[in-house]
């Protein structure tokens, strides 16, 4: 039986940084395809945020509404929404 996680009590046992990294990896096809100017902007802002010491979870959180709008893969969108619910 899996352990029940209560994110409001603690983020203990939730590796949000790893989940955010996996999400960034999953977004690479969108970024590389560059079919929308947002992706170049997103990549630039990610680099700026990371240089300031902010992690990828913060970057994803800042652009969450736009990401939800642009992601066309239902499975990837579900992963993003799970990340939002669990870690943000």
Curated annotation (Swiss-Prot):
Transmembrane segments: none annotated. It comes from the Bacteria. The gene is cowN. Is required to sustain N(2)-dependent growth in the presence of low levels of carbon monoxide (CO). Probably acts by protecting the N(2) fixation ability of the nitrogenase complex, which is inactivated in the presence of CO. InterPro entries: CowN. Belongs to the CowN family. HAMAP family: CowN. This is N(2)-fixation sustaining protein CowN. NCBIfam families: N2Fix_CO_CowN. Keywords: Nitrogen fixation. GO terms for biological process: nitrogen fixation.
């Amino acid at each position: 039986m899996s352990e029940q996680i209560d994110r409001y009590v603690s983020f203990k046992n939730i590796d949000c940084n790893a989940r955010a990294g996996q999400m960034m990896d999953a977004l690479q096809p969108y970024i590389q395809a560059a079919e929308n100017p947002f992706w170049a902007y997103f990549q630039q802002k990610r680099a700026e945020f990371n240089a300031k010491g902010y992690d990828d979870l913060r970057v994803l959180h800042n652009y969450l509404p736009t990401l939800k709008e642009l992601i066309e893969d239902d499975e990837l969108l579900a992963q993003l929404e799970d990340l939002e619910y669990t870690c943000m």
